[in-house]
Regions:
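Extended recognition/assembly regions associated with phosphoester-bond processing machinery
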Residues: 1-417
Length: 417
């Protein structure tokens, strides 16, 4: 039994940092499968026209501006047009805008062009401002500062403000949740030659054991890429044992059927799954869902309440745009990107870069309210961190190193739960 438990027992959940182990000795089978899905994403009638993109950014701006006002305690002094009209040399102004452009200066600071519906303004952010290194185009930020003393139009920023999570705004499930556990994994990649089938089967065997931690698991959240897919990258077929995506899902369904009755899997798609690549991604199509007997299928991202815990689950493709543009964020430490997502209140701020986005009528990548827990996958890393009291879980992979990963320098932390 100890050999069976050892790979998973201590990494099973963050509850060890939240409550004593004895408080989590309840059996999950004694509690109902209560869940609620906040919003179903990716169901769109948009055509991807220019006006659709404009409307998306209008919605993004208005939504995050409201978050600034109601949750972050920061209110704009007016529109950019109003501020220009009323500007004074010795008066402080608060501005909220979308970052149209951000460029480094010779001094190390940034010249940032902000935009709202009424116009644009160029502001200067000093290099010693902690936010200087993290400003990204297309995100919504707030700045506080003054116009140049000479009476010009240059705006000097005293501080950059993000619509970050306030401690007083944390939900914490309202204290009304069942004493059961949620297990997390991601990037299983069934159908790949590097799928760690032996490790996966050992985990399922442990989940079926009498171990009290295993008996306490109610939900098993799989944050995307449950299969390896086909044609994802050049030469992909050479790394597959199953070259038909439907057969890959059939294998996944068979494996999940081996879960004990008290554990319900929750499946969202990732960039290897058989859905559109642009985020937000819809849930797997009905023909695929039919292969699974008891799984809950959601889109990507998903905001789902499980036994009273508000979980934000996101595959994590937006990390691909943050890593090359923000210092101290890497694929080895994706939790730093997750912290920025919460600070910025957006899962994928940049438009049209490595991560494709769909111009929905409503920007479904905005984090409108603080979750109780935030989980991602995609990077094949594994860690647990915290931001403003919110647990951040980077789900581990069940895929070993592929030639493509070696080319990219990926070093997966595999086989953790």
């Amino acid at each position: 039994m100890d050999k069976l438990r050892s790979p998973y027992h201590d990494t099973m959940r963050i509850a060890g940092e939240v409550a004593e182990r004895n408080a989590w000795a309840a059996k999950a089978s004694d509690f109902s499968n209560d869940y609620s899905l906040w919003q179903q994403v990716g169901q769109t009638n948009q055509k991807g026209k220019f006006d659709d993109i404009v409307n998306l950014f209008h919605n993004r701006f208005e939504t995050i501006q409201e978050i600034f006002r109601t949750q972050a305690g920061f209110k704009a002094s007016g529109s950019i047009k109003q501020i220009f009209r009323e500007k004074g040399r010795n008066k402080d102004y608060n501005i909220v805008g979308i970052v149209l452009d951000a460029r480094r200066t010779k001094s190390g600071g940034k010249m940032v062009t902000l935009e709202d519906r009424t116009g644009t303004i160029t502001v200067f952010v000093r290099k010693d401002d902690p936010a200087c290194a993290t400003i990204m185009t297309d995100e919504v930020i707030g700045v506080s500062g003054r116009f140049d003393k000479s009476g010009g139009e240059m705006f000097w920023v005293n501080r950059v403000v993000y619509p970050d999570i306030l401690t007083s705004n944390q939900n914490k499930g309202g204290g009304d949740f069942d004493p059961v556990s949620i297990a997390f994994a991601s990037d299983i990649h069934m159908g790949s030659k590097e799928f760690l089938e032996a490790e996966w089967d050992k985990m399922i065997e442990w989940m079926n054991s009498a171990d009290e931690t295993a008996q306490n698991i109610k939900w098993f959240v799989l944050s995307g890429d449950v299969v390896d897919g086909i044609g994802i990258y050049p030469g992909h077929e050479n790394n597959l044992t199953i070259t038909n995506s439907f057969e890959q899902y059939e294998m996944c369904a068979r494996k999940l059927d081996e879960l004990p009755d008290h554990i319900t899997p929750v499946i969202l798609p990732g960039n290897h799954d058989a859905v559109r690549p642009a985020e937000p991604q819809p849930m797997l199509e009905p023909a695929v869902q039919e292969k699974f007997n008891s799984a809950i299928h959601v889109g990507n991202p998903a905001r789902i309440t499980l036994s009273g815990i508000d979980v934000l689950s996101y595959h994590g493709k937006g990390i691909d745009d943050i890593v090359p543009r923000v210092e101290n964020v890497s694929y080895e430490h994706p939790e730093e990107a997750m912290k920025l997502m919460l600070k910025k209140r957006h899962l994928a701020p940049m438009w049209g870069e490595r991560n494709a986005l769909s111009p929905e009528e409503e920007d479904q990548m905005v984090i409108r309210t603080p979750p109780d827990l935030f989980v991602t996958g995609h990077t094949h890393a594994h860690t647990v961190e915290w931001h403003r009291g919110i647990p951040l879980v980077v789900s581990s992979t069940f895929q070993g190193e592929t030639d493509f990963m070696n080319m990219l320098g990926y070093k997966p932390k595999k086989g953790f739960l």
